[in-house]
Every structure is written in C-alpha cells, then in structure tokens.
C-alpha cells in the first residue's frame, strides 16, 4: 500500500492554495504528523483501519479535524483522500457536487 508523506501533503496544500486562494502555511506540525499517520494506527498488532477506504476516510477526516494548516484544511483533506485512493488503484466516480455535500454536509 502506498502512503502519502508529510512533504507530499505540504506540497499538495501549497499548490491547492495557489490555485484556489487562501493562506499557505502549517499551523501545527504535530497535528499534521498525527493526521498523516492516523490511518496507520495499530492496536494489538492489528491495523485499526483495516481497508484502503477506511484509511482514506481517516486521512481526510484527520486533516479536516486536526486543522494543521493555516487555511484550506477541508480542501487538503478531500484532495489527500482522493490522491491516496488513486495512487492505490481506486478512482471515485462521484460528482464534484457529491464531494462538496459529503465534505461540508
């Protein structure tokens, strides 16, 4: 399974902010580290998030809730989740509106 690294997510965030607007920068490096590694937590030698989809959901959720960046946390949470799925061979076929409603709603 391929993982996204912290430097990759920071680069994605900077590109996203440049394209969509907002303030670039990390607000809390520890919260970023926590968010990026949360999908790979183990308990008793077993992954807490067993499926690729569960890991992707946890990555997106953690980036949104931990708020590690100054701005654009919801945007990077969704983008990181989609990229994580894609690099692992899963491409979503939902509409942009579905994504927005599920992320914000």
Label every PLM stretch briefly.
Residues 1-105:
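FIC/Doc superfamily catalytic core
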